[in-house]
Amino acid sequence: MQRVVILDGPDNCGKTNIGKELSRQTGITYFKNQDEHKYFLKDPEYFVHAIRYVDTYFTSYLESSGASVILDRAWPSEWIYSKALGRKSDLGVLEELDRRHAALGTHIIIPYRTDYSRFKDDYDQVNDNIKKIHDLYMDFSVWTKCKVLKMNVDDEDLDREVKEIREFIDA
């Protein structure tokens, strides 16, 4: 059975640790784009190009192959960060990706915290907008047609988090 899981949430919520452990336990390939930080400030257009050309291409691959994957950030990040940081985006492509991923049965996991004050990101733009980013993730969870699990990670209990995700994606 195909499993497409997207871990997407505010910075410093443990997405990478959760994704790697979920991959270890399920055998589903984990993927994180290592280039996103290279372009975050230098070329904001990178992200709109990524959703237009890379994410649509990769979604076609998922549709035709039946492959399973755990993605550490994906197109939902563009929905949130373009709004939070005032970047140009392409809502039409985001709507298309959402529709196609809903048809795939994609599960989106949004880890979040009740307090972000102890955590600092590498980018001041993120630190200055963390409350807005959090709120936009909550808005996204209502907007998307995909299955969404909003998961509080204040306790940083990786075993509980992965167990909760596994129960959600297996339901």
Q: Across the structure, where does each feature detected by a protein language model lie?
A:
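NTP-dependent small-molecule kinase module
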Residues: 125-171
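Short, solvent-exposed loop/turn segments at secondary-structure junctions
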Residues: 11-13, 75-77, 114-117, 155-157
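A mobile, often basic/glycine-rich helix-loop segment
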Residues: 79-95
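Pre-Walker A (Motif I) flank of P-loop NTPase domains
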Residues: 1-4
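Conserved P-loop NTPase "ATPase switch" module shared by AAA+ and STAND
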Residues: 67-79
